[in-house]
């Protein structure tokens, strides 16, 4: 996708100077004649004694041999410096191009993390593949080796042609009729991840780690053999023939587009904590915190119609109070209230273009939890109802999602309208459930609704919508 974005224009393809700008990171070998070579490259000072214009007849034979050797060393170092300069210039231009793509002026904190990841990759601290899951995903690190984000490339998704997980390839080969989810748009998982973060921020839920679309290239990503051979060939050409290598649009591996989600520390799988809370019940105030956080997860999953929400792909962070059993009676101990938070990750299988109606229903597994039987609290009503009841807010949300989704090369406007129709129906059901004081369990039992834009031959200032219920149910229904 990046073959058409030249890194070095033909006008800039002249051989570079031998001297480097400060901070380029290049170092010249300390060899005899180095100072003479730099002076000659700069075009200042008299010609060295071994230059062709010097009267060699007056030199002793030993000095002539030394001069010829120094000239040969100077030429070798000059060629090496020229290759290093060309490589540094191309690399700097490539980094600048990636940074222009990965520009997030509206979120400077997120941009700082992306810059840290880019610098780490330049320093050969590459992302590490995550072996769990059904797609190619990677822990992205900073220059200190700390995990700062999770990157999921588009072409390594479960339906991508470069998915490194052989189990999905085997499933696609042996059982194609059961492969994939026909209610989802193929190869848009990275947009679904970023879209879930967008919805989370618009609704002020604050449970999805910030996620955006980012371009990254790394040796540890899964590339085709052709891409790797082309990259090695271009690098070899740049080293051997810098004039030719400078004319390539790109030297390294092609950058991959994908979702870049900030890494959250101190969280564990919800299944771990939920089992522990069954054995060790939480205090009343802490249990109230968990319930409020759980309601935010329900709101997010229901609006985006997440088709892959189990208890193993959302996280809980529980900061237990200080254990003062080992403290003496005379010690003063600061007792703090336990803090519990929820993080909704793995949102790549959301935003369907229709409600599931084929084989599987893809239920919300949190609906079987005890927290799902408690009616929605007044706090979540005050937070969500004013927003989702406002047509202007819904319209702004749709426009923001459109600006995000249209970045995909395979974007289809008709499919996007279907995705939005499903989301409108989910918002309609959620609004009614909150007003009727229902519980999350009652919410998921409501009939699926699709709200489409009504077609009219007359122009009007406001849009009208048509509401329809889905009567067809999946073969394996869960109610």
Swiss-Prot record:
Residues 165-178, 268-276, 359-368 are annotated as: Important for interaction with membranes. Keywords: Acetylation, ATP-binding, Cell membrane, Cell projection, Cytoplasmic vesicle, Endosome, Golgi apparatus, Kinase, Lipid metabolism, Lipoprotein, Membrane, Mitochondrion, Nucleotide-binding, Palmitate, Phosphoprotein, Synapse, Synaptosome, Transferase, Ubl conjugation. It is an enzyme of class 2 (transferase). GO terms for cellular component: BLOC-1 complex; cytoplasmic vesicle; dendrite; early endosome membrane; endosome; endosome membrane; glutamatergic synapse; Golgi membrane. Its EC number is 2.7.1.67. This is Phosphatidylinositol 4-kinase type 2-alpha. It comes from Mus musculus (Mouse). The modification N-acetylmethionine is found at residue 1. A lipid is attached at residues 174-175, 177-178 (S-palmitoyl cysteine). Membrane-bound phosphatidylinositol-4 kinase (PI4-kinase) that catalyzes the phosphorylation of phosphatidylinositol (PI) to phosphatidylinositol 4-phosphate (PI4P), a lipid that plays important roles in endocytosis, Golgi function, protein sorting and membrane trafficking and is required for prolonged survival of neurons. Besides, phosphorylation of phosphatidylinositol (PI) to phosphatidylinositol 4-phosphate (PI4P) is the first committed step in the generation of phosphatidylinositol 4,5-bisphosphate (PIP2), a precursor of the second messenger inositol 1,4,5-trisphosphate (InsP3). Associates with the BLOC-1 and the AP-3 complexes; the BLOC-1 complex is required for optimal binding of PI4K2A to the AP-3 complex. Interacts with BLOC1S5 and DTNBP1. Interacts with ITCH. Interacts with FOS; this interaction may enhance phosphatidylinositol phosphorylation activity. Interacts with ATG9A. The modification Phosphoserine is found at residues 5, 9, 44, 47, 51, 462. Pfam families: PI3_PI4_kinase. Residues 124-453 form the PI3K/PI4K catalytic domain.
């Amino acid at each position: 996708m990046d073959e058409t974005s030249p890194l070095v224009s033909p006008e800039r393809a002249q051989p570079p100077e031998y001297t480097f700008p400060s901070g380029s990171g290049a170092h010249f070998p300390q060899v005899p004649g180095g100072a003479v070579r730099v002076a000659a490259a700069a075009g200042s000072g008299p010609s060295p004694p071994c230059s062709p214009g010097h009267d060699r007849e007056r030199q002793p034979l030993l000095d002539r041999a030394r001069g010829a050797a120094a000239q040969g060393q100077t030429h070798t170092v000059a060629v090496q410096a020229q290759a290093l300069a060309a490589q540094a210039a191309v690399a700097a231009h490539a980094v600048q191009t990636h940074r222009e793509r990965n520009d997030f002026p509206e979120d400077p904190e997120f941009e700082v993390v992306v810059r840290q990841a880019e610098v780490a990759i330049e320093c050969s601290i590459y992302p590490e593949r995550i072996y769990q899951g059904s797609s190619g995903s990677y822990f992205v690190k900073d220059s200190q080796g700390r995990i700062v984000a999770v990157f999921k490339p588009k072409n390594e998704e479960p339906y991508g042609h470069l998915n490194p997980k052989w189990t999905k390839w085997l499933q696609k080969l042996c059982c194609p009729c059961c492969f994939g989810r026909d209610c989802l748009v193929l190869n848009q998982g990275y947009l679904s991840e970023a879209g879930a973060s967008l919805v989370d921020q618009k609704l002020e839920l604050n449970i999805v780690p910030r996620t955006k679309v980012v371009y990254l290239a790394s040796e540890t990503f899964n590339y085709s053999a052709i891409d790797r051979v082309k990259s090695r060939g271009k690098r070899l050409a740049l080293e051997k023939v810098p004039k030719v290598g400078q004319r390539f649009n790109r030297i390294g591996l092609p950058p991959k587009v994908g979702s870049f989600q900030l890494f959250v520390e101190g969280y564990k799988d919800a299944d771990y904590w939920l089992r522990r809370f069954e054995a060790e019940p939480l205090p009343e105030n802490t249990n109230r915190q968990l319930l409020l956080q759980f309601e935010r997860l329900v709101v997010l999953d229901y609006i985006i119609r997440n088709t892959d929400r189990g208890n193993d792909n959302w996280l809980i962070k529980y900061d237990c109070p200080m254990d003062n059993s080992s403290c003496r009676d005379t010690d003063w101990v600061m007792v703090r209230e336990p803090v519990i938070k929820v993080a909704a990750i793995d949102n790549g299988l959301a935003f369907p273009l229709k409600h599931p109606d084929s084989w599987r229903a893809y239920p919300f597994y949190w609906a079987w939890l005890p927290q799902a039987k408690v009616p929605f609290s007044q706090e979540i009503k005050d937070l969500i109802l004013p927003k989702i009841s406002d047509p202007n807010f819904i319209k702004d949300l749709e426009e923001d999602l459109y600006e995000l989704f249209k970045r995909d090369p395979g974007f289809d406007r008709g499919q996007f309208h279907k995705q939005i129709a499903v989301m409108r129906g989910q918002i309609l059901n959620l609004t009614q459930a909150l007003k009727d004081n229902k519980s999350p369990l009652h919410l998921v039992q409501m009939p699926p609704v699709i709200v489409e834009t009504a077609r009219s031959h007359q122009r009007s200032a406001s849009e009208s919508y048509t509401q329809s219920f889905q009567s067809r149910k999946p073969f394996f229904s869960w109610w």
